[in-house]
């Protein structure tokens, strides 16, 4: 359990980290909800005692072979090509990606644009202001089987914690340790 506070700049100041041994998890999958809930309860209680606060909500991380990535490409036609791509065109593309459905047994945890292409030939980081008739993008979808996520949510609810959202531990680790230019250059984080 890590407890932090968001700074005005959007960073997170970590106030405390509490780790407890846990049984009932195999390859990232919760197999015994009682054992997992007990370990969460112990860690949360210790963090609450250290900080003098009550924890009722949490952002959770999840990892295992049931988390995967899939790419999806789509496009929109630029609303006003004479004036170039604007934020409404980018938003329209995001809306199309939000309508992409996961298989029945999975849920989409995140949708991350990998690149933008204007008129099938000009790749750009930020398409706003570019000229063209068609805006395309390849998005990386982070997918997770529903059952492991539901069990994690259930374990947190058993100790009175509402799960605000869940993210892939791999994504969370990269966000925590890599600078924006390192991510742009393709630096890899290896968590052993």
Where are these regions (language model features)?
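Nucleotide/phosphate-binding catalytic cleft detector across ATP-hydrolyzing
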Residues: 2-58, 62-190
């Amino acid at each position: 359990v890590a407890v932090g506070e968001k700074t005005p700049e959007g960073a997170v100041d970590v106030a405390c980290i509490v780790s407890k041994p846990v049984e009932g998890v195999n390859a990232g999958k919760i197999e015994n909800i009682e054992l997992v809930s007990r370990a969460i309860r112990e860690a949360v209680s210790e963090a609450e005692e250290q900080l003098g606060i009550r924890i009722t909500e949490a952002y959770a991380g999840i990892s295992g072979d049931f988390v995967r990535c899939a790419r999806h490409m789509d496009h929109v036609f630029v609303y006003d090509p004479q004036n170039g791509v604007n934020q409404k065109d980018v938003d329209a593309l995001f809306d199309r990606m939000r309508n992409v459905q996961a298989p029945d047994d999975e849920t989409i945890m995140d949708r991350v644009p990998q690149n933008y292409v204007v008129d099938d030939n000009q790749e750009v980081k930020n398409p706003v202001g570019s000229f063209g008739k068609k805006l395309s993008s390849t998005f990386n979808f982070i997918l997770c089987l529903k059952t492991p996520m539901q069990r994690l949510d259930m374990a947190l609810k058993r100790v009175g914690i509402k799960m605000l959202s869940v993210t892939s531990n791999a994504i969370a680790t990269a966000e925590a340790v890599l600078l924006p230019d390192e991510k742009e250059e393709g630096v890899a984080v290896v968590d052993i």
